[in-house]
Amino acid sequence: ADAVRCNIGGGSICSTRLVTGHGLPGLQTIFDCARTDRDVKIIADGGIKTSGDIVKALAAGADFVMCGSLLELLTSARGEKFKEYRGMASKDAQMEWRHKSSTPEGVASYIPYKGSVLDILQDLEGGIKSGFSYTGARNLTELQHKVEWSRQTPAGTRESSTHIFSQNGVQK
């Protein structure tokens, strides 16, 4: 194979891990795949919600990332306010492409659009560039060699996001 798509059940509308009892956290899957054969390109799929997730996936060994829900829900040229979003293993998707449904491993829903493609892509680009700079990396190879990993607790995750508004303020 020229490339391997890593991660089962990590997508925002996927229930494969719950239905089948199979799958690992996305970052662990990327680590495992990247260690096996570096002649094969690694595609990270599922669980990418922020530019920071992209940087972590690339640092773990991914050569590419898929950004399903992150990019899927951007402004439509049709001017609609909601868009159908569904997993490829959802009942609706199975009926469309197989004309029958086995046990669904995903859901379908209508989700509000998030904004313009240009704004989101500029934000992602800025976050990725910043992530590389914090690592001291000028390219993907340097990122993967210079990265230092540590475990983060749930308290550390809460501290990492904005949190003043939940205590005593209203976000502007």
Indicate where each model-derived feature is located.
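Glycine-rich, proline-tolerant flexible connector loops at the mouths of alpha/beta enzymes
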Residues: 11-19, 74-75
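Non-cysteine beta-strand/loop elements that form the S-adenosyl-L-methionine
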Residues: 1-10, 67-68
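Alpha/beta catalytic cores of nucleotide-metabolism and tRNA/nucleoside-modifying enzymes
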Residues: 21-44, 48-172
